Every structure is written in C-alpha cells, then in structure tokens.
Amino acid sequence: MNVQGVEFLACLSSAQRIAAALAVIALGLAGLPEPAAAASGRISIESGGVARTALLIEHRRLKKARRPVVIVLRGGKDRAARLRRVFGFEDMARSSGPVLIYPDPIGGHWSDIAGAEASRDATFIRDLIAKLVSDGVADRHRIFIIGVSSGGPTVLRLACDDANLFTGVAAVVTGMPADLAATCKPSRPLPFLMIAGTADPVVPYKGGKSNWPEGKTDLVSVDAAMAIFVKAAGCGDGRTTTAFPDRDPHDGSRAYLDRWNGCKAPVELVRVEGGGHTIPGHVSAPSVDSARGPRNADIDSAKIIWDFFRRLGD
C-alpha cells in the first residue's frame, strides 16, 4: 500500500479501517487461482473375455504424467460414490495428485473364496494396472491398493500372489480367508497396513466365520494374517505400540498403532480396541453403526493410509 493509502486509512474509524483492509485482501484473493478440481470418468476393458469397468478420479489440472495410483476395492454394498464420501480420498487427489481407481465388481461383490471367481477378479485388477501403465497414466513403481470389508480378500490374494505389482497394500475392516492363509507366501517384503476393530461383528478379530451379506467365509485371526506379512518382511522380535490421542472419549473405543521392529518393509496394524465393522473417522448413520458395532472417532483412516503410502512412494 502507498503513502496516500496509509494516510487515507488513518482518517477512518476502526470499523472503517477493518472494512477497507478486508476489501484489499479480497481483491488480492480474487487474483489467485481457484482450487483445483478432480475430474472423474470411467474405464472399460475386456478381462478374461468379460467387459469390466472402473471409476477413475484424477486431478484435472495436473500435467499428464505417470502418477501414483491408488486402487480401492470396496465392500459389496458400497458404491464408488459412497466410498468416495466415506474415505475422503478425493481431497488427496486435489492436493497430492494420485489417480484414484474404484473397480466395479461383477454382481456387486468381490469373491472372498478361492476358485474361478477369485481368479477372475484378480486377473481384472492385473489387467487394469497393465492398461493404466501402458496408457501412461500410472507410475509403475507407485501402485497402491486398498481392500475394504468384503473387497479385502481379493486384495489380500493379490498381495500373496503378486507382491511385485504393488508398492504398498492396505486392508480395512476385513479378514484373510483361511484357505488363502494356508498358502500365502508373498514373494518379497511387502509394505502392509491393516486397520481392524476388535469388536467387529462382521469380520471376527480372532478369526471364525465372516458375516458378510455375500456369505460366510472361514477367516483366520488378524494376528495370524499379520504374521504372514511380518514373516515376509523379515521383521525382528517384538513390536512397538503407540496409542492415538483419545479425541472422542465417548465413542467406546481406543485406537493403537502396532509397528513391527526390524522389518525390511514396514508392517503396521491400526488396532481399534472396541471398534466395530466401521471405517474409523467416517460418520455414518446411527442405524448403520448400531448394526456394525462402535465407530471410532479418534483417527482419520484416509489420512493414516495415505501417510503410509506416501512414505513409500517418495
């Protein structure tokens, strides 16, 4: 501001000076670029002789270049639009630039048991990644995948059978089928993060029959699933446990971060003591919470997952 402007403000009342200053700030902000938007579209490919589709979300104003890709396999009843609201990953598409992919399952659900359907779904994800890489969208060395609820078993199968495809894997309120646990041997140390509630009525923390709408599946315990990735990562003895701040003392749960020591790749568990079959940090309808158990409000699942992935991709 010039000298005349200063003299002018000096003659004004306090209220007038504040109003004038706000006007100047507004003029300055008017010249700034608008927040970047995320563009969405659909991908169609043929996989195994079947037409398959996925929703793609990308940063509209970023230059076209190979970028990190985050693939999210949702639970059976969750549509892509709903999961986008649940996770909040779209905000990261604006600020950090990953391409977000929400593949569509056939018949509304992913296969959670071994067999032709499980093989078909895994092949679809492989074919989808190949297309993203060949089209110059994906950075082959920064491909991440997340499995939520009944979308988790497909992700875990891929982690067991195709560890080299992914830079990092996250599994959220899901479980590992017993048949998979018996044969799972990741080919390399694989960065792995799991978020699980100890009071989950759908996916028992200590193992047992799942209660997914698609059917009941024998699952191993969370500890048994983690042990597979701990072994693959060559971790040492013991783990370090850190409590997250208890931001909501009335939510009936506490969240802890377990980090295994001496690993060649990070292996971490966000253990929600008293948590149900809900994504921590997501606000859902009370009727949903009552059916799925307590919802933890102390942590932001999307931020935890993205921070984990970002450490791997830098």
Role assignments for model-derived ranges:
Residues 3-22:
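Bacterial N-terminal signal peptides that target proteins for export
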Residues 194-196:
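Short beta-strand/loop motif that positions the catalytic acidic residue
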Residues 175-192, 208-209:
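Flexible "cap/lid" loop of the alpha/beta hydrolase fold
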Residues 24-31:
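Hydrophobic core
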Residues 41-144, 153-157, 161, 206, ...:
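Serine-hydrolase catalytic machinery in alpha/beta-hydrolase-like enzymes
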Residues 198-267, 275, 281-299:
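Active-site-adjacent alpha-helix of alpha/beta-hydrolase-fold enzymes
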Residues 32-69, 95, 99, 115-120, ...:
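A domain-start/cap signature at the N-terminus of enzymes
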